[in-house]
Amino acid sequence: MLEVPVWIPILAFAVGLGLGLLIPHLQKPFQRFSTVNDIPKEFFEHERTLRGKVVSVTDGDTIRVRHVPWLANGDGDFKGKLTETTLQLRVAGVDCPETAKFGRTGQPFGEEAKAWLKGELQDQVVSFKLLMKDQYSRAVCLVYYGSWAAPMNVSEELLRHGYANIYRQSGAVYGGLLETFEALEAEAREKRVNIWSLDKRETPAQYKARK
């Protein structure tokens, strides 16, 4: 009978242990996340990019997407509440006018910003770079849509079209694009596009502070 070298079972154990630790990490990019709270903390720490199908536009800077893992398609019959089967994303670095909520009148251009965003994103598959999770358990993201070869940044487009100003409150994140955002905001303001056409204007932050 051949004697098995002592290092072989040790190697087999080490390989098995390594695979046991590695496989869960390899599976995560292909796992579907039902809510933002399902997304691992390290995905935010490393600013991972995910993708999903837009199923609802809440307002000009908030959407709900059904996460679509890489190598999967966006089709499928999903049942259940949107709050339990979708990710709520807050578009990073911008603030759109508030829409009417809870019996309170909305701001000028709030509905227009929402309608524009819905026209651009509804039922589309988008990619989104995770920056942070906010106090409302929303994923604050840079959202991209359109051609894979020349994707458009939602934050930039909202600023370009005068449907948002730069978000400058506590906890603001820009994904390294603040200078770009400032240039786009300044250009829209100079052209008096949409929100910048108003002679007297209240920012969304000022509006919310009046509650």
From Swiss-Prot:
Positions annotated with a glycan in the UniProt record: N153
Catalytic residues (UniProt): R90, E98, R138
Domain (TNase-like): residue spans on this chain: 48-198
Protein name: Endonuclease Htp3
Source domain of life: Eukaryota
Family, similarity comment: In the N-terminal section; belongs to the RxLR effector family. In the C-terminal section; belongs to the LCL3 family.
A single Gene Ontology CC term: host cell cytosol
A GO MF label: endonuclease activity
Subunit description: Interacts with the host cell surface endoplasmin gp96, in order to get translocated into to host cell. Interacts with the effector Htp1, in order to get released from vesicles into the host cytosol.
Region (Binding to the host cell surface): 200-211
Pfam families, alphabetized: SNase
Keyword Calcium belongs to the record: yes
Keyword Ribosomal protein in record: no
Localization per record: Secreted; Host cytoplasm, Host cytosol
GN (gene name): HTP3
Gene3D superfamilies assigned to the protein according to its UniProt record, in alphabetical order: 2.40.50.90
Signal sequence coordinates: 1-20
Domain comment, as recorded: The conserved RxLR motif does not seem to be involved in self-translocation into fish cells.
EC id: 3.1.31.-
Function: Effector involved in the disease saprolegniosis in salmonids and other freshwater fish, resulting in considerable economic losses in aquaculture. Within the host fish cells, Htp3 is released from vesicles into host cytosol where it degrades nucleic acids.
